[in-house]
Curated annotation (Swiss-Prot):
Name this polypeptide is given: DNA polymerase IV
Annotated localization: Cytoplasm
Species assigned in the record: Yersinia pseudotuberculosis serotype O:1b (strain IP 31758)
GO BP terms, alphabetized: DNA-templated DNA replication; error-prone translesion synthesis; SOS response
Subunit structure: Monomer.
C-alpha cells in the first residue's frame, strides 16, 4: 500500500508573525482584514482560538468575542518565503508533492529510501527540520490513503503527528464520524443522521443503492471513504482551476432576502479560501449557482479580475428574477475561476 503524509502548518500566518515578533507569542492574535472594511479572519493563534476566534469569521465578530485581540493585515511575502523553504524540505524526501495551499500539502513517500523507508520517521524528520530551520511547527498525518492522512494530521495538533497503519484502517473507520469526511457539511450530516447514519461503520452496513438514491454521486464517495477506499493519486502538477463555496439548505427558500443573507455569509468564506489558495493573482471570472427544488440549476458568471461582493449579489439577483420561475431554492453557491493555467502552474511550482 502507499505511504501518504499530509503536512499541515500550525496557524501558519500567525505563527510567522509570532516568530518574527516574540511579543505576539502569548497574546490573542489574528491575521485578517479590518472590521471597518468588513474584513474576515484568515487565521488566528491558539490564545485567540480559546475565545472562539476562527478563520473565515467576520473581523467584527472576532472583536466581540475577544476585545483585546491584536489584528495584523498580514505579510504575504513573508508567508510565501516560508512556504518555499518548507517545499524545499519536502523535496529532500520525495518529488511527489501536492500542495493544497500555502500551508499544507500531501506527500507520497512510498518509494522514498529516507529513514529506512519509514513514513512515520520521514514525517518526524520533516517536522523537526521545519522547527529547526524556520522556527515554526507543523502537524502531520500518515496513512495509506489521502483522506485518512488529512484527518490524521488534525488528531495531534499542534506540533504532533498521528499514524494510521493498513491494519488500523478498519478499526479507525468504525467509529469515525461521517462529518470528518471531506464534503460532509452540517446539512449533509443532518440528512445522514436522519437515516440513522453517524459513523463510517454504519455506512458500511448500508446499501450503496440507497446512498446513491439519497445523495447522488456523492453517495458513492461516502460509501468508498467509509470502506477505506480513496484511489486519488498525489498530483505534483495539480492545477487548481477554481475556488468555490456552496451551501445546501435544510429547507427551500422562496424570498430574495434569505438568499441575499446567505450570499453575504458565503462570500466571507469564499474570500478566506481565495486568500489562502491564491493570495495575489487576479481571477478570471466570478459567478453564482442556484439549485432549485426540482434539482435543476443555473449558473451565472461575470468576467471581472477582482472578487467583488456587489457584483456577485447583482448576478445572483438577476438569476433569482430570471431563472427561478417561483421555484424554491435548495442550494446557493459562489465560485471564482482562476486567471490562467500557466500562472496557476507557476503559483504551485513556486509554492505560492
Amino acid at each position: 500500500m502507499r505511504k501518504i503524509i499530509h503536512v499541515d502548518m500550525d496557524c501558519f500566518f500567525a505563527a510567522v508573525e509570532m516568530r518574527d515578533d516574540p511579543r505576539l507569542r502569548d497574546i490573542p492574535l489574528a491575521i485578517g482584514g479590518s472590521k471597518e472594511r468588513r474584513g474576515v479572519i484568515s487565521t488566528a493563534n491558539y490564545p485567540a482560538r480559546r475565545y472562539g476566534v476562527r478563520s473565515a469569521m467576520p473581523t467584527a465578530m472576532a472583536f466581540k468575542l475577544c476585545p483585546q485581540l491584536t489584528l495584523l493585515p498580514g505579510r504575504m511575502a513573508a508567508y510565501k518565503e516560508a512556504s518555499q523553504h518548507i517545499r524545499e524540505i519536502f523535496a529532500r524526501y520525495t518529488p511527489l508533492i501536492e500542495p493544497l495551499s500555502l500551508d499544507e500539502a500531501y506527500l507520497d513517500v512510498s518509494d522514498s529510501l529516507a529513514c529506512g523507508g519509514s513514513a512515520t520517521l520521514i514525517a518526524q524528520e520533516i517536522r523537526q527540520s521545519i522547527a529547526s530551520e524556520l522556527n515554526l511547527t507543523a502537524s502531520a498525518g500518515i496513512a495509506p490513503i489521502k483522506f485518512l492522512a488529512k484527518i490524521a494530521s488534525e488528531l495531534n495538533k499542534p506540533n504532533g503527528q498521528y499514524v494510521i497503519t493498513p491494519n488500523q484502517i478498519q478499526p479507525f473507520l468504525q467509529d469515525l464520524p461521517l462529518s470528518k469526511i471531506p464534503g460532509v457539511g452540517a446539512v449533509t450530516a443532518k440528512r445522514l443522521q436522519a437515516l440513522g447514519l453517524v459513523t463510517c461503520g454504519e455506512i458500511q452496513k448500508y446499501p450503496l443503492a440507497e446512498l446513491l438514491k439519497h445523495f447522488g454521486k456523492f453517495g458513492r464517495v461516502l460509501w468508498e471513504r467509509s470502506h477505506g477506499i480513496d484511489e486519488r493519486e498525489i498530483s505534483p502538477d495539480r492545477l487548481r482551476k477554481s475556488v468555490g463555496v456552496e451551501k445546501t439548505l435544510a429547507e427551500d427558500i422562496y424570498d430574495w432576502e434569505s438568499c441575499e443573507a446567505l450570499i453575504e455569509e458565503l462570500y466571507l468564506e469564499l474570500e478566506t479560501r481565495l486568500r489562502k489558495v491564491k493570495p495575489d493573482l487576479h481571477i478570471a471570472r466570478q459567478g453564482v449557482k442556484l439549485k432549485f427544488h426540482d434539482f435543476q440549476q443555473t449558473t451565472q458568471e461575470h468576467t471581472w479580475p477582482v472578487l467583488n461582493k456587489a457584483d456577485l449579489l447583482q448576478i445572483a439577483h438577476a438569476a433569482w428574477n430570471e431563472r427561478r420561475a417561483e421555484r424554491g431554492v435548495r442550494l446557493v453557491g459562489l465560485h471564482v475561476t482562476l486567471l490562467d493555467p500557466q500562472l496557476e502552474r507557476q503559483l504551485l511550482l513556486d509554492w505560492g
